[in-house]
Amino acid sequence: MAAIRKKLVIVGDGACGKTCLLIVFSKDQFPEVYVPTVFENYVADIEVDGKQVELALWDTAGQEDYDRLRPLSYPDTDVILMCFSIDSPDSLENIPEKWTPEVKHFCPNVPIILVGNKKDLRNDEHTRRELAKMKQEPVKPTEGRDMANRIGAFGYMECSAKTKDGVREVFEMATRAALQARRGKKKSGCLVL
């Protein structure tokens, strides 16, 4: 039996951990060096609830220089991973300011999973000290959940690509959301207008 194919697009601020999350999930290795992304595609097989799903993973660049390029990734998307970094309250602020309006414009009705990346840094002393200098602190789980409710996300997950904690669960939730999203339409997904 052929695998079901679904397309996942990951968005969020530059350096918030999108590419690492995809690489750890698809290749099981953590890249130690930061390389800003233009577009990279991976395919990963995942089984959820007894269904084999071939997940096409579309990476995107969060930097503003790519704001005009990024929409090319959106057509026919089945699920969006919208990421912020737990060590960057500013990246959480950009979820309702930038990412939600962009995604809802290009991908109306596509389920969104809000993902808090870099969970391992929440209790990291160095991270806490650096944030304290700016009168900030790491994002709390309740703040992530509240934001997910505010933007109407399908769900909220936290993970650490570095420790692999929660990584698989993020993609399992995303796959379930993509499978449920076939609400009787022939072709769900995004339009570029």
UniProtKB/Swiss-Prot annotation:
GO terms for molecular function: G protein activity; GTP binding; GTPase activity; protein kinase binding. It is a lipid-anchor. The modification 5-glutamyl serotonin is found at residue 63. Ubiquitinated by the BCR(KCTD13) and BCR(TNFAIP1) E3 ubiquitin ligase complexes, leading to its degradation by the proteasome, thereby regulating the actin cytoskeleton and synaptic transmission in neurons. Ubiquitinated at Lys-135 in a FBXL19-mediated manner; leading to proteasomal degradation. Phosphorylation by PRKG1 at Ser-188 inactivates RHOA signaling. Phosphorylation by SLK at Ser-188 in response to AGTR2 activation. A motif (Effector region) lies at residues 34-42. The modification Cysteine methyl ester is found at residue 190. GTP binds at residues 12-19, 30-37, 59-63, 117-120, 160-162. It is an enzyme of class 3 (hydrolase). Keywords: Cell cycle, Cell division, Cell membrane, Cell projection, Cytoplasm, Cytoskeleton, GTP-binding, Hydrolase, Isopeptide bond, Lipoprotein, Membrane, Methylation, Nucleotide-binding, Nucleus, Phosphoprotein, Prenylation, Proto-oncogene, Ubl conjugation. Residues 191-193 form a propeptide. GO terms for cellular component: apical junction complex; cell cortex; cleavage furrow; cytoplasmic side of plasma membrane; cytoskeleton; cytosol; dendritic spine; lamellipodium. Regulated by guanine nucleotide exchange factors (GEFs) which promote the exchange of bound GDP for free GTP, GTPase activating proteins (GAPs) which increase the GTP hydrolysis activity and GDP dissociation inhibitors which inhibit the dissociation of the nucleotide from the GTPase. Activated by GEFs such as ARHGEF2, ARHGEF3, ARHGEF28 and BCR. Inhibited by GAPs such as ARHGAP30. Inhibited by GDP dissociation inhibitors such as ARHGDIA. It is found in: Cell membrane; Cytoplasm, Cytoskeleton; Cleavage furrow; Cytoplasm, Cell cortex. Residues 61-78 are annotated as: Switch II region. Its EC number is 3.6.5.2. Its main location: membrane. GO terms for biological process: actin cytoskeleton organization; apical junction assembly; cell junction assembly; cell migration; cellular response to chemokine; cleavage furrow formation; cytoplasmic microtubule organization; establishment of epithelial cell apical/basal polarity. Small GTPase which cycles between an active GTP-bound and an inactive GDP-bound state. Mainly associated with cytoskeleton organization, in active state binds to a variety of effector proteins to regulate cellular responses such as cytoskeletal dynamics, cell migration and cell cycle. Regulates a signal transduction pathway linking plasma membrane receptors to the assembly of focal adhesions and actin stress fibers. Involved in a microtubule-dependent signal that is required for the myosin contractile ring formation during cell cycle cytokinesis. Interacts with ARHGEF28. Interacts (via GTP-bound form) with RIPOR1 (via N-terminus); this interaction links RHOA to STK24 and STK26 kinases. Interacts with RIPOR2 (via active GTP- or inactive GDP-bound forms) isoform 1 and isoform 2; these interactions are direct, block the loading of GTP to RHOA and decrease upon chemokine CCL19 stimulation in primary T lymphocytes. Binds PRKCL1, ROCK1 and ROCK2. Interacts with ARHGEF2, ARHGEF3, NET1 and RTKN. Interacts with PLCE1 and AKAP13. Interacts with DIAPH1. Interacts (in the constitutively activated, GTP-bound form) with DGKQ. This is Transforming protein RhoA.
